[in-house]
């Protein structure tokens, strides 16, 4: 809120920041983009995403390097999402960050300084009011 709109309705610093980064201009009712710097080392990490994420459209996890850019790599893709990702038998999805050498599904190869952005399109009231959050990425056990 306060990012885009009439001169009277915006918060100047939010407006400047959002226009500088160039994306994220949709209102929160249409999309939310939590950016996460997990402070985890390069290794095998994962997020266990439940079968039902309270969004009206879809969700995605996008991987970035420490400069906020996609990192060139041998494996395809910089994103795992609810449309193209492989689901577990119970409908949940395991998103792997690191440990991709064995060809596992839904895996994003990580690098030093990695971070990620979760994109939630048409977030439900649970997300908007903060009673539901996307599962954290944790070291694999």
Go through each PLM region and give its residues.
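A compositional/structural signature for long, glycine/proline-rich flexible linkers
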Residues: 1-141
């Amino acid at each position: 809120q306060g990012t885009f709109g009439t001169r009277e309705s915006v918060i100047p610093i939010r407006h400047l920041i959002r226009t500088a980064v160039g994306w994220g201009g949709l209102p929160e009712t249409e999309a939310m983009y939590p950016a996460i710097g997990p402070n985890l080392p390069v290794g095998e990490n994962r997020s266990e995403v439940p079968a039902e994420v309270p969004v009206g459209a879809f969700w995605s996890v996008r991987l970035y390097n420490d400069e906020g850019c996609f990192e060139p790599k041998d494996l395809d893709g910089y994103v795992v999402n609810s449309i193209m990702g492989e689901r577990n038998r119970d409908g949940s999805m395991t998103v792997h960050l690191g440990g991709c050498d064995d060809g596992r599904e839904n895996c994003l190869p990580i690098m030093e300084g990695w971070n990620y952005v979760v994109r939630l399109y048409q977030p439900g009231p649970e997300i908007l009011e903060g009673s539901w959050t996307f599962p954290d990425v944790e070291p694999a056990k």
